[in-house]
Every structure is written in structure tokens, then in C-alpha cells.
């Protein structure tokens, strides 16, 4: 029995955000990063490089595609299922393309009490994201029909005193009540 191909193992559905991310092609920069990480571990522990390599891929490619899983597995001498286990275990790894502007809304206690759930509802309403298709395990990211915006809940973003807080890509925003959602989105018009 042969091993399943990663595309058979991974649910990487195309989303409207896919148009903002080119297909995965290993770059010279990725090869150099993988080589740098691999020399940090003894030969019998090369699999330890999987996390830093996956973080690099997601940072540069937006998400971890089936092709990226396959490349990582081949580069580390692993079966693709071993890489998929890591990708599917950690909620920070995305298996489908987010929007051009990815919004992470803190949902821990201070932010929840400050209105982060209402903020999430308002962001979804303004961007046309269907919250009923989002869940905390398999599809935590909702993508707008135009592909420009995506939203997901995040655990603590470490600014409890200025709740509710969110991040848009790498930009941090404090005190973003639901009634400020429209102003927030206006800053990120494509």
C-alpha cells in the first residue's frame, strides 16, 4: 500500500483569498532557510526543523498548502502525514488562503468582556463573511467573497488593558469596539 499524496490528506480548499497568494514554489530563500535549520539538528533529529520551516512557509506564502507539506516532508525525509500532523495540530497554521488583510480578533476574557465577540460579528457583517461556516477546529478562518478580508479568533494578544484588540496582518489595534469596525476596515481598502 503506497502512502497517500498530501493533496489527498489535506483539506486545502480554494478560498476567495487564494488569488492573493501565488502557488507554492520553493524559493532559493526557502531552500536556504531549510538548510540553515537542518544543520541545527543531528541527522537522527531532522524532523525537529519542521516547525521553523512551516512558520517560514506560512509567513512568506500566507498558508501551508498540500504542495508545501509535500516539499517539507521530502526536504526532511518524512512521510507527508508526519508534516500534516504538525500543521493540523497547531491552530496558528492555516491550510487555506486567508484574505489579503487577515484580521485576528482576541477572544480571551478581557477582550470578550470588552466586546470582541460583537466585534467579530460586525466585521463578518461588513465584509460579507458567513460566520456559520467558521468553527474553531477545521475552518477557523472566514474569508470575504472578494478575498480581500479574512477573520479568525485568536488567543490572547497581550493587551488586556486596551480590550478589545485585534491585529490586521502585522498591525496591532487597541480599543476596537464593534462600532469602530467600519473605520478599521476603511484603513485597509485594497
Question: Where are the language model's segments positioned?
Answer:
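Signature of N-terminal electron-transfer/Fe-S-associated modules in redox systems
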Residues: 2-190
Amino acid at each position: 500500500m503506497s502512502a497517500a499524496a498530501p493533496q489527498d490528506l489535506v483539506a486545502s480548499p480554494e478560498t476567495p483569498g487564494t488569488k492573493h497568494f501565488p502557488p507554492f514554489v520553493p524559493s532559493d530563500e526557502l531552500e536556504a532557510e531549510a538548510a540553515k535549520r537542518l544543520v541545527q539538528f543531528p541527522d537522527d533529529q531532522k524532523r525537529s526543523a519542521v516547525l521553523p520551516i512551516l512558520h517560514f512557509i506560512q509567513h512568506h506564502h500566507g498558508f501551508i498548502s498540500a504542495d508545501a507539506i509535500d516539499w517539507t516532508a521530502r526536504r526532511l525525509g518524512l512521510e507527508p502525514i508526519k508534516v500534516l500532523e504538525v500543521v493540523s495540530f497547531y491552530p496558528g497554521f492555516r491550510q487555506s488562503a486567508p484574505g489579503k488583510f487577515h484580521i485576528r480578533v482576541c477572544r480571551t476574557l478581557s477582550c470578550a468582556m470588552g466586546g470582541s465577540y460583537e466585534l467579530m460579528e460586525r466585521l463578518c457583517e461588513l465584509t460579507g463573511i458567513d460566520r456559520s461556516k467558521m468553527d474553531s477546529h477545521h475552518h477557523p478562518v472566514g474569508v470575504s467573497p472578494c478575498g480581500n478580508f479574512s477573520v479568525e479568533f485568536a488567543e490572547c494578544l497581550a493587551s488586556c488593558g486596551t480590550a478589545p484588540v485585534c491585529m490586521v496582518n502585522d498591525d496591532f489595534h487597541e480599543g476596537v469596539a464593534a462600532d469602530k469596525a467600519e473605520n478599521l476596515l476603511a484603513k485597509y481598502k485594497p
